[in-house]
Amino acid sequence: MSAHVVRTLAELGDAITLAPERHLATRLVSGDGAPLGTLVDVRSERVEGDDLAHAVVFDTTHARDGILDVRAALRASAPPSSAKKRVHAGDLLVSRLRPYLRQIALVLPSVRTACGGRAMACSTEFYVLSPRTPGESLAFLLPWLLGDETQAILAAAQEGGHHPRVPRELLLSMRVEPERLRVRKALSARLERALRDALDARRRLSRLIEE
């Protein structure tokens, strides 16, 4: 069944975006709650020089279902040959290329420890989200970003030809429901514990395999 959206010229924004995917996805974004852009900042700081040469680099294939595959990133043998974004503990990485494939992960403090003090970097295909409130955990956003409704919006929002991407503006306009915001501190604590357990289990499994 076909669908259509009517927009005035003023609603198209500065870029005069005519891609139907943008507006069909935007139609799903309305509702109560806080726009993601009011909860996070998008950082684009680059890693350069010696830091880049020795950095642990996370590619989009290293992020899935909230967890970073640190062991796979550490196995990379060749130094980075292109620009990379700096990553800090507490950041939330969202692939702008394939978030609908669940390429989303939280950077726990234990990830920094596992990197042995080396700088952490990621592909420029990630949106690097940091909390607007210093020290706040963004773990509570994982079930929302990985939920069926949000995943459907992200899948519909892709724009472009050979490598379609999700627009930053649409991602930041998506609304986090009030109920989740009210319990975010407790929810983040539970999710961080579960993520730490999952990372520990993955680390133990890797050691057994490599023996």
Show the residue positions of the predicted features.
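Non-catalytic DNA-recognition/assembly elements of restriction-modification systems
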Residues: 1-49, 180-211
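Short, positively charged
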Residues: 137-162
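A structural connector/turn signal
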Residues: 81-82, 161
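DNA target-recognition patches
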Residues: 37, 43-80
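A short beta-sheet element
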Residues: 95-145
